[in-house]
Curated annotation (Swiss-Prot):
The keyword Glycosyltransferase applies. PROSITE patterns: ER_TARGET (PS00014), FILAMIN_REPEAT (PS50194). A motif (Prevents secretion from ER) lies at residues 499-502. Belongs to the KDELC family. GO terms for biological process: protein O-linked glycosylation via serine. It holds the Pfam family Glyco_transf_90. This is Protein O-glucosyltransferase 2. Its EC number is 2.4.1.-, 2.4.2.-. It is found in: Endoplasmic reticulum lumen. Protein glucosyltransferase that catalyzes the transfer of glucose from UDP-glucose to a serine residue within the consensus sequence peptide C-X-N-T-X-G-S-F-X-C. Can also catalyze the transfer of xylose from UDP-xylose but less efficiently. Specifically targets extracellular EGF repeats of proteins such as NOTCH1, NOTCH3, FBN1, FBN2 and LTBP1. May regulate the transport of NOTCH1 and NOTCH3 to the plasma membrane and thereby the Notch signaling pathway. Widely expressed. Gene3D superfamilies: Immunoglobulins.
Length: 502
């Protein structure tokens, strides 16, 4: 996907730079803009990133691509002979670019040069005065308030406030005894304790493989910031668990999906979390890669709605049925049968998977529940198609911030008005395009990697403040071992060294 070399730069695409004179627009290196968290030494992310906005010589911003190779990016460590950094320049096709880079070692300082035809852009070169730590470096900032400021985290997050409002207090002693009794035999749970910035776990139930996603984000957080001592339970299953109607004796359980019929505390989904941790690693679908693969411009997109997936909900069967009746409006098909195998002859045959990026050849994306909320919604929103979202009792951590008719087109849960909504979108093309743009902006501004880290920390911080007894390393718990250091490029934490010298 990318190479690592002495100075690693990767550029996507082959469109030449715009450098014409005369009546053509000319890109201005001086007036173009560069900003973002990847220019700050102390913002540690698995893949750091910043933005470039192309501006012409008259000061006007480009609103379409000025060419995918107009900017050249070089990242180096002036004090080192070798620099292990993978770099990608992603053209968002709207006049802006994401530059993302993944570090495989830590450096005293880091120099970022952005050029256009050999000329520095904006205030390039940018020097990150370090140490600048890579993702696997265990060097937490002790001052969590300072970390929150560096990360530019929101003061309050409404979904967290709503979820925690069900629990005026939390007693770790009580939940340690009661939750395993109530849920431990029938469900898949992880009992975690964070103590002295170390992670401990005890699993309950048979199918606990998904703990790897929770282990990974907790270890990543503890490498970056001093986490509060906290004890909690994570539901590894699809469905939210705490369904008691009254507040009496409800249990705080963390889940990746919430519902209007449950009281679970919602976290970012394991899918979105994993895509953040593995950006420029083992995943190819993430919130940044989508932005560089949004297909043709709106006017050139296919005017049918597209959907692919498995048969995990009866409404999906209805969608495929609608597609067969109205192929001029909907292109929907199953890629796998599992839940309704006996109906495969009616709703099959199954079709081959298509690249997620190929979805954006279509103007209209249908988001419909699977077993719970469809975890693809963040990626659909950050593309440049308009999303038709099914009404649902299920929600992810950000749904309460979305507004129907502003960020997406709502569709009734039984899909009875889907055809009507599609026809509306076709007849109101400019309005549909505006909704697509608003949804995209929401995802760009709220669902990036730093937003996910902020959400997790604020959630655990708020939960820890409710505890009325001290979290404990319970009987049967084992430490979640951190990743071993790279012997070739070890991490030397200056914070730990300074603390040891006190």
């Amino acid at each position: 996907m990318f190479s690592i070399s002495l100075l690693s730069c990767l550029f996507l695409g082959t469109v030449p730079a715009l450098a014409q004179t005369g009546g053509e627009r000319r890109l201005s290196p001086e007036k173009s803009e560069i900003w973002g968290p990847g220019l700050k030494a102390h913002v540690v992310l698995p893949a750091r990133y910043f933005y470039i906005r192309a501006v012409d010589t008259s000061g006007e911003q480009f609103t379409s691509s000025p060419g995918e190779k107009v900017f050249q990016v070089k990242i180096s460590a002036p004090d080192e002979q070798f620099t292990r950094v993978g770099v990608q320049v992603l053209d968002r096709k709207d006049g802006s670019f994401i530059v993302r880079y993944r570090m495989y070692a830590s450096y005293r300082n880091l120099k970022i040069e952005v050029k256009h035809h050999g000329q520095h852009v904006a205030e390039s070169p940018y020097v990150l005065r370090g140490p600048v730590y890579h993702e696997n470096c265990d060097c937490p900032l002790e001052d969590s308030a300072a970390w929150l400021r560096e990360m530019n985290c929101s003061e309050t997050i409404s979904q967290i406030q709503k979820d925690l409002a069900h629990f005026p207090t939390v007693d770790p002693e009580k939940i340690a005894a009661e939750i395993p009794k109530r849920f431990g035999q029938r469900q898949s749970l992880c009992h975690y304790t964070l103590k002295d910035n170390k992670v401990y776990i005890k699993t309950h139930g048979e199918h606990v493989g998904f703990r790897i996603f929770m282990d990974a984000i907790l270890l990543s957080l503890t490498r970056k910031v001093r986490m509060p001592d906290v004890e909690f339970f994570v539901n590894l299953g699809d469905w939210p668990l705490e369904k008691k109607k009254s507040n009496s004796n409800i249990q705080p359980i963390f889940s990746w999906c919430g519902s209007t019929e449950s009281r679970d505390i919602v976290m970012p989904t394991y899918d979105l979390t994993d895509s953040v941790l593995e950006t420029m690693g083992r995943v190819s679908l993430d919130m940044m890669s989508v932005q560089a693969n949004t297909g043709p411009p709106w006017e050139s997109k296919n005017s049918t709605a597209v959907w692919r997936g498995r048969d995990s909900r009866k409404e999906r069967l209805e969608l495929v049925k609608l597609s067969r009746k109205h192929p001029e409006l909907i292109d929907a098909a199953f890629t796998n049968f599992f839940f309704f195998k006996h109906d495969e002859s009616l709703y099959g045959p199954i079709v081959k998977h298509i690249s997620f990026f190929d979805f954006f050849k279509h103007k209209y994306q249908i988001n419909i529940d699977g077993t719970v909320a469809a975890y693809r919604l963040p990626y659909l929103l950050v593309g440049d198609s308009v999303v038709l979202k099914q009404d649902s009792i299920y929600y992810e951590h950000f749904y309460n911030e979305l507004q129907p008719w502003k960020h997406y087109i709502p569709v009734k849960s039984n899909l009875s008005d889907l055809l009507e909504k599609l026809k509306w979108a076709k007849e109101h093309d400019a309005e549909a395009k505006k909704i697509a743009k608003a949804g995209q902006e929401f995802a760009r501004n709220n669902l990036m990697g730093d937003d996910i880290f902020c959400y997790y920390f604020k959630l655990f911080q708020g939960y820890a403040n409710l505890q009325v007894s001290e979290p404990q390393i319970r009987e049967g718990m084992k430490r979640v071992e951190p990743q071993s250091e790279d012997d070739l490029f070890p991490c030397t934490c200056h914070r730990r060294k300074a603390k040891d010298e006190l």
